[in-house]
Amino acid sequence: MSSLDRKKPQNRSKNNYYNICLKEKGSEELTCEEHARIIFDGLYEFVGLLDAHGNVLEVNQVALEGGGITLEEIRGKPFWKARWWQISKKTEATQKRLVETASSGEFVRCDVEILGKSGGREVIAVDFSLLPICNEEGSIVYLLAEGRNITDKKKAEAMLALKNQELEQSVECIRKLDNAKSDFFAKVSHELRTPLSLILGPLEAVMAAEAGRESPYWKQFEVIQRNAMTLLKQVNTLLDLAKMDARQMGLSYRRANLSQLTRTISSNFEGIAQQKSITFDTKLPVQMVAEVDCEKYERIILNLLSNAFKFTPDGGLIRCCLSLSRPNYALVTVSDSGPGIPPALRKEIFERFHQLSQEGQQATRGTGLGLSIVKEFVELHRGTISVSDAPGGGALFQVKLPLNAPEGAYVASNTAPRRDNPQVVDTDEYLLLAPNAENEAEVLPFQSDQPRVLIVEDNPDMRGFIKDCLSSDYQVYVAPDGAKALELMSNMPPDLLITDLIMPVMSGDMLVHQVRKKNELSHIPIMVLSAKSDAELRVKLLSESVQDFLLKPFSAHELRARVSNLVSMKVAGDALRKELSDQGDDIAILTHRLIKSRHRLQQSNIALSASEARWKAVYENSAAGIVLTDPENRILNANPAFQRITGYGEKDLEGLSMEQLTPSDESPQIKQRLANLLQGGGAEYSVERSYLCKNGSTIWANASVSLMPQRVGESPVILQIIDDITEKKQAQENLNQLQQQLVYVSRSATMGEFAAYIAHEINQPLSAIMTNANAGTRWLGNEPSNIPEAKEALARIIRDSDRAAEIIRMVRSFLKRQETVLKPIDLKALVTDTSLILKAPSQNNSVNLDVVADDELPEIWGDGVQIQQLIINLAMNAIEAISQADCETRQLTLSFSGNDTGDALVISVKDTGPGISERQMAQLFNAFYTTKKEGLGMGLAICLTITEVHNGKIWVECPPAGGACFLVSIPARQGSGT
């Protein structure tokens, strides 16, 4: 026989092997071989030793069990003939080829599949290697076969590959959808421009033919033209976005004077600046020539200036400057004295469809594309745009553009047949302002008895349109937002309120809420206008607070008809209220109920559809299992989540009873709870219980069970909501195990601190035993022997040996690692053992220890060792506190008693130490909190854990006389338990 001495390989080349030395075995080597065999069989992965020809010499136990093989079956036989490789002839041939390669001196490593699990009945993937091992002469004598189970890794890799493929498909789908969206925008924009051209062209011809502003239709023509231009701008913007998304947006470079371009664009805003009393300051050089796309440069300046004018309050300041920045760059800055832009939003404002709203400012209507377009156009020019705080407050936008076009780009000369100077633009198109609309909210004294209608709408043109539709039949006054409307209503209540939903300062739904809160206004009928087609919002408003809901766009005829109905009902209600005022009837309530009932009837189908859609969405997409059962607990319906949790398909659950999914030991309690629920003896209940899955496994869940609302005569339906908490339970179990380990480690550490005291306690009886043994020997050695004295010496030896044995028994019991087992605790023995353990440390620290216990103590169930550990931890803390504080009175009192009702054991650990501050008390039981220079701060946290395991409580009190008193309450328990 010989043993193997491994040496580290000297060469990590292709021929990678170990050198070995052969020695004769002695007894020491045999022992080492036995140890090696134990380690070899204890290895978790596949390990085998082959001779140079690939015949099996040794294989570890794990590999043998995985393949369902015994070593005697394969020892001395070719490795590739073993059961592991009998998946197919190809697998066997591959393994034979690998062995031949390794036998030639080459290290082999690859991933293979073998029959390596469930006794050779299951295929697993293995990271397999063959390492040639040579002797001192360089001859190959062994092949070391090693394998690591990578089945889970392979599955994960396959799943990852599948997910990556799905992700690639999703990305491709998104790309196609994005292209389709851009194509759709482009086509729709082109299609819309044709009818818009046919609106604007004839309109301009009609306006040119009319007799100027004296024409009775001039105002309507202006409204049509202004809104058609606004729509055309939005269509052009969408078309630009589609081109940019399709990377079809190019630049038409031209040598131009940026100063002249900027000056001309800025001049279009001077009228608006004067109208709003805004100081508009421009600082431009005489000339700055650059190669830019003039049209896109104009759009950049227009959008930045319109943005500044939107947010700058009346009397504010706006600056537009142009200057050189670094070599070959133009810097455009636009600053305002508005509310500014918070740093957190400075990236978002350049995103598409993002609108920044500022409370108290004029409405910022629009598409939210202005700054996005600016950023896109700037980046097309290879420039940059940024926003920061303006000096003195407000926003400061800075645009940097290169003065020269990229090398190779075509640049048109300033004499090319395009306009040399930018055209004058209509700034209303960019600011979305209607002229002369500032004083619309002013209310003139009403001169007639016509019903009053208040219109609340932030769009001036829409306000004017509604006012024109109704002014012939009603006294109409208007407000631009909810706050102004509320102020007007308080002074002059209308007979009808017509309000838009989305407005600045105060929205329409907030206005409705405020109106309904005021008793003097609560009877006013309300009509809501909205461009948002939201069925759920519509149902909510109609059912709770408003009388009508009208979607934009609407016809003048429909508006008049609806207004007439609501005003007629209001006038009739007022007349009835006046007629019946002496009878004390509240006709307003009756009228409100009548209107409310009518609208409930009208909207019932819509509400039902919305409710069913919400329920279906919750039912099908909820992560919790939802099951409907009949009174016999047979399954009527189960949602996909429940099917996924239990592994049953929809067809599997047809006719199945929930009892069949319930473990037999839980079935009686489940039946009783359901019976109580059906008989009215119990309300809705929740319980933690287990379920049997289709594959035979068990899951844990929180089950909430209740009765569904039912009509008279209908059979009851039970709703069960199941929340899978299997992983949570496993995590809790792992946490409990960790807590048990922590408690044991703490117990060991405590006993380590007691080592000196225990040695002292054992040394005393051992010394007495030696003394009495010597004395007994002398008494027996006398002539004649003194038998009585010798017997007394032996009795003392027995007494002292019993004392030493009791101390050792107590230490072994305290250090024993075991699961928490709840059983009756011998409290007298517990008190005695604890007193014995604490005797030495209290004496060594000059602390007077008193242990007081009632004659009759409640019987408690628990883990005696853990309760003892809890008491010792508290007592040692007290001894240490007394010693470090150098107290005059050094007293520690342990007391054991029943509480007032006799249903709990109360343990008190009271000391005369320095006490505990209020700040310390708040963190006292937190893990890792300590007031000591040394220590982990885990002692009291472990005490809390032990108390909670026993369903008890622990708290601390500070007596007026000083010191600290820790109290532990452990409930008494009837019956038996584990």
From Swiss-Prot:
Enzyme class: transferase
PROSITE patterns the record matches: HIS_KIN, PAC, PAS, RESPONSE_REGULATORY
Domain annotation PAS: ranges: 32-103, 611-681
GO molecular function, one term: phosphorelay sensor kinase activity
Record field: catalytic activity: ATP + protein L-histidine = ADP + protein N-phospho-L-histidine
PTM entry text: Autophosphorylated. Activation requires a sequential transfer of a phosphate group from a His in the primary transmitter domain, to an Asp in the receiver domain and to a His in the secondary transmitter domain.
Residues where Phosphohistidine is found: H190, H760
Gene3D superfamilies the record matches: 1.10.287.130, 3.40.50.2300, Histidine kinase-like ATPase, C-terminal domain, PAS domain
Positions carrying 4-aspartylphosphate: D500
Function of the molecule: Member of the two-component regulatory system TodS/TodT involved in the regulation of toluene degradation. Phosphorylates TodT via a four-step phosphorelay in response to toluene.
Protein name: Sensor histidine kinase TodS
Organism whose genome encodes this protein: Pseudomonas putida (strain ATCC 700007 / DSM 6899 / JCM 31910 / BCRC 17059 / LMG 24140 / F1)
Lineage: Bacteria, Pseudomonadati, Pseudomonadota, Gammaproteobacteria, Pseudomonadales
